[in-house]
């Protein structure tokens, strides 16, 4: 599958969306950064406050979240993995609002948080996000495995289930408040 900057996304289709830190810099330095990004994603997806058990764990009250969520069900989150210098999202578009609007809000919001927290000036993300259209179920399942194995392949953990910042616990029923649509993969 070719990766490119998608300008148009289609209703009922799925996409692998990813981006990394500018100059390959780490953009997630501590648990608060990972949780903040995931919390922003959940809010934008219209999930209930406290999805993924996040909210009570966020301690930085100076960096408040100011986001308008999309209606629940506008997008489907199939799986995700947040790594120190990049992120992967496997998303479905369920309506007319393009995934690009979701990612723009997510990246802008997280960049504002990151720049304020670390007194950083300039771009946080290297470029516009990249996306690949998921053409068939076989590729979708392969991509889910690729996304979940990322931390293990990178040598960050010994087992995939040890990485806290992915949807893998949703898939092995280790998270009570699972947020991903597992039906497409399992």
Please give the residue ranges for each predicted region.
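Short catalytic/metal-binding and nucleic-acid-binding patches
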Residues: 1-179, 185-186
